[in-house]
């Protein structure tokens, strides 16, 4: 199944704005796709964010600033956040996006069936 990897941080305003939309999309897609957040942040900051923002129930991994290096390996040349990668069902990179997401475009892509 397709996988969405979203690199984000609690200190990144566009990242914070799109988290509820990603959570809603994860619930909507259910088992048809996986959404994972990788935080360029520390555990305490992420925990505080999730306590203040109910409903963020997709997996969130903490990588600290190593997340920025990892995102560069996935094609984030400038190292900015948010950065999102979509993998198809075979694990190949299908799409990369720097900056705030167009959640409707992401939804359409994931529901199109082209990634399975």
Tell where the protein language model's regions lie, with residue ranges.
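Proteins that catalyze or organize thiol-disulfide redox chemistry
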Residues: 1-3, 23-27, 89-92, 104-116
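Alpha/beta-hydrolase fold active-site loops
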Residues: 2-3, 33, 82
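Hydrophobic beta-strand core positions in alpha/beta domains
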Residues: 4-6, 37, 85-86
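Conserved hydrophobic/aromatic "anchor" residues
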Residues: 7-8, 49, 57-58
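Active-site-proximal beta-strand/loop segments in catalytic clefts of secreted hydrolases
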Residues: 7-8, 38-41, 63-64, 99-100
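Structural microenvironment flanking redox-active thiols in thiol-disulfide oxidoreductases
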Residues: 16-55, 65-72
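Thiol/disulfide oxidoreductase modules built on the thioredoxin-like
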Residues: 52-57, 62-111
């Amino acid at each position: 199944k397709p996988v969405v990897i979203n690199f984000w941080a609690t200190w990144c305003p566009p990242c914070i704005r799109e988290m509820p939309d990603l959570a809603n999309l994860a619930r909507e897609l259910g088992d048809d796709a996986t959404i994972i957040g990788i935080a360029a942040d520390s555990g305490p900051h992420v925990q505080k964010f999730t306590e203040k923002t109910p409903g963020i129930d997709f997996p969130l991994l903490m990588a600290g600033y190593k997340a920025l290096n990892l995102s560069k390996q996935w094609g984030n040349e400038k190292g900015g956040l948010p950065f999102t990668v979509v993998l198809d069902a075979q694990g190949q990179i299908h799409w990369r996006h720097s900056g705030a997401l167009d959640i409707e475009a992401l939804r359409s892509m994931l529901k199109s069936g082209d990634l399975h």
